C-alpha cells in the first residue's frame, strides 16, 4: 500500500492537499449556525443519491407516472424508505438554505470582498426552489398537477410575452406530457448540473476568502 501511496503522492502531492485542508484556520466566533451551508450540501447529496435510485423505477409519462410512484412506495425493495428520505431531505434542504441565507445576511457575509460568493449563493437558492417546483409535479397526482398549472400560468400576466412564456414552460397550451417531460429533464439533469457548477464556484471562494466576521 505504501508504494501505491508513494506513486500517487509523487504525482499529485496528496499530503500537501491534505495539510492545506486540515490546517485551515477556523475563527473562534464560528458556531453551529455557520454549519447551515454544509448541512444544505449534505441534503443535496442525499437528494442526488435517492433521486438516482428512484429513476430505476419512475416512468415520466402522464399515464404511468403516478402508478410508478405507487410501485416505488409499495412494491420496490426499500422504495418507501428511499422516497421518504428524498421527500424529507428536500424539505430539510429548503429550510437549511433559508436559514443559511439569513445567517449570511445578518453577519454581513455579502459585503466586500464576498459579493460574488453571495451572488452564487443566491443563484443556488433559486435553483433549490426550482428543484421543489419541478419535483412536485413528477408524481402526477392532483396536488402536483394543479401546483404546476398555477406556477406555469403566472407568467401569463406579463404583457406581450406572457402567453409564449407559458407555452415555453408547459411545452404546449395546457399541462400535459410535454410539461412532465420538461420538468423531469429539468429536475434530473439540468438543475443538478447547474447546481454542481455553481457549488464548484461557491465553495472555492469561501475557501479563499474565509469565513465572515461575527455579528
Swiss-Prot record:
Amino-acid positions noted as binding heme b 2 in the UniProt annotation, renumbered to this chain: 86, 187
Chain segments annotated as transmembrane: 32-52, 90-110, 116-136, 186-206
Molecular function (Gene Ontology), one example: oxidoreductase activity
Main location class: plastid
A cellular-component GO term for this protein: chloroplast thylakoid membrane
Keyword Iron-sulfur appears in the UniProt entry: no
InterPro entries referenced in this protein's UniProt entry, alphabetically: Cyt_b/b6_N, Cyt_B6_PetB, Cytb/b6-like_sf, Cytochrome_b_N_euk/bac, Di-haem_cyt_TM
Chain positions recorded as heme c binding sites: 35
Residues at which heme b 1 binds: 100, 202
Record's subunit section: The 4 large subunits of the cytochrome b6-f complex are cytochrome b6, subunit IV (17 kDa polypeptide, PetD), cytochrome f and the Rieske protein, while the 4 small subunits are PetG, PetL, PetM and PetN. The complex functions as a dimer.
Name of protein: Cytochrome b6
